[in-house]
């Protein structure tokens, strides 16, 4: 089974392998997906820069891909990783650190 990229970018929810904690949400195009499969590190597509980026390439806070899951419509991906350092560019463990309720 493969993701359906016919409508463009797919959301990729990144979770920590041991805790299943949600670390971040990013987007993948087909090239980012293929690079992720090949390198076992996360690659995403930046909508603002309109280019690929490798998580942790500059910070060293890389994500080692353990498994990938595809949803029932083949248009969303869950990426299970072993995170090195914080996932968020702010230095927080997860990008979801602002509690609303």
From Swiss-Prot:
Q: Which domain of life is it from?
A: Bacteria
Read off the Gene3D superfamilies from this record: Phosphoribosyl-AMP cyclohydrolase
Its predominant location is: cytoplasm
Pathway(s) it belongs to: Amino-acid biosynthesis; L-histidine biosynthesis; L-histidine from 5-phospho-alpha-D-ribose 1-diphosphate: step 3/9
Query: Which cellular component appears as one GO term in the record?
Result: cytoplasm
Q: Which residues bind Zn(2+)?
A: 72, 88, 95
* Catalytic activity reported: 1-(5-phospho-beta-D-ribosyl)-5'-AMP + H2O = 1-(5-phospho-beta-D-ribosyl)-5-[(5-phospho-beta-D-ribosylamino)methylideneamino]imidazole-4-carboxamide
Q: Give UniProt keywords alphabetically.
A: Amino-acid biosynthesis, Cytoplasm, Histidine biosynthesis, Hydrolase, Magnesium, Metal-binding, Zinc
Q: InterPro entries of this UniProt entry?
A: PRA-CH, PRib_AMP_CycHydrolase_dom, PRib_AMP_CycHydrolase_sf
Q: What is its EC number?
A: 3.5.4.19
Q: Which Pfam families match?
A: PRA-CH
Cofactor(s), names only, from the UniProt record: Mg(2+); Zn(2+)
| Cofactor remark from the record | Binds 1 Mg(2+) ion per subunit.
- Function text: Catalyzes the hydrolysis of the adenine ring of phosphoribosyl-AMP.
**Subunit field text:** Homodimer.
Query: Would you identify the family this protein belongs to, as annotated?
Result: Belongs to the PRA-CH family.
Question: Can you name this protein?
Answer: Phosphoribosyl-AMP cyclohydrolase
- Supply the source organism for this entry: Bacillus thuringiensis (strain Al Hakam)
Q: What is the lineage of its organism?
A: Bacteria, Bacillati, Bacillota, Bacilli, Bacillales
Q: Which gene encodes it?
A: hisI
């Amino acid at each position: 089974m493969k993701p359906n990229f016919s409508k463009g970018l797919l959301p990729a929810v990144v979770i920590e392998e041991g805790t299943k904690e949600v670390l971040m949400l990013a987007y993948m195009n087909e090239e980012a997906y293929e690079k992720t499969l090949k390198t076992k590190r996360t690659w995403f597509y930046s909508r603002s820069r309109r280019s690929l980026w490798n998580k942790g390439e500059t910070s060293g806070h890389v994500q080692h891909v353990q498994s990938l899951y595809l949803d029932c419509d083949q248009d969303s991906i869950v990426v299970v990783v072993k995170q090195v350092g914080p996932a968020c560019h702010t230095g927080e463990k997860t990008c979801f650190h602002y509690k609303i309720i």
